[in-house]
C-alpha cells in the first residue's frame, strides 16, 4: 500500500507466524494471529463471503491453471497458499474463527452449472457453517435450475463473468436475474477486469443488468478491481449493490491494481448499529466523528463485506485482514466489514 496508511495492529511476519509460540505449528501460529484480530475488535468471529469449495477434480484444474500462469491470471505468479485436502481447508477456516463462509463455484461452459449446484447441495448438507452456494450460466433453462437451487436451500450465488466469458446482460440470463432479485438472494459476481480483462468485464454490462433489475443484490467481487471507482458509482446508484474486499488492498494486488486513495472515504460512511454488541456481549463506542458520512448517500460502510478468496490466495489469510486494518477507516468499520454486514445480509 502507499505510504501514509495507518495500522491499528501489527501483522506478523512469516518467521513470526512460524515461531509464534514454542511448540506451535505454522497453521496454529497463523490461527492465533487471525483470532487475535477479531477478538481485539470484540467480534464473535468472521463472516467471509468469498471462499472457494468445489468438486476436487474442478479445484485441481483451477490450481493447475494458476500454476501454469493461464491468461486470466494476467501473467502474475500466483502460488496457492492453502493447497490442501478439503477437510484440512475446512479445519483451517474453523481454526481461524470464520463462523460463516461460502463455496464459490462457477462454470466455464454450458451444461456445467446444474452439475455444480447438485454437488453444492451435498456439500452444504455436510458443512453447516457454509452458506449454501449455487451458480448459473447463460443457457436455456437457467431460470428453472436457479429456482431449483433456491428450493434446495441456496443462500448465495456466484457468477464469474471473466471465466465464463459471457455478457451478464445476456437475454438468456434475464429471467434468472429476475428470480434472484425477487428472492432477495445475494449474487457474488466477478465482473471487474482484474487480474486480466475479459470481453464482457467492466461496469457497463453490469449497469445494464441493474437498470433492468434494480433490486438485484449483486456483491461486486474484489471491490470491482481494477475499475474500483466505476463500481463504487454503481453501488451508490443502486441501494442493493454491495462489494466484497477479496484480495483488494493487499500488497499483492496493490502491485498491479492499486486502490485509489481518493476513493477511501466512499468505503466508509457510518455503519448501522452493529450485531457484534449483542453477539459478543461487548459495549461499543459511538462511531468516530472523523468518519463522517460522505456527501453521496450515507456512504457504503454497511455494504462492504469481507471476502478473501481462500484457499486460492498467494499470501496468508491474516494479510487480508491486516490490509483492511491499515486503511485507517476505524474499528467500527472493521467490525461492520469483517462480521456485522455479512451477518445482517445472511441473517446469522
Over which residues does each language-model region extend?
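Short, acidic/polar
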Residues: 83-93, 115, 139-149
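Short, well-structured secondary-structure segments
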Residues: 90-93, 97-112, 119-137, 158
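Catalytic pocket-lining loop regions of alpha/beta-barrel enzymes
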Residues: 155-159, 166-304
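Conserved, mostly hydrophobic/aromatic
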Residues: 50, 120, 149, 157, ...
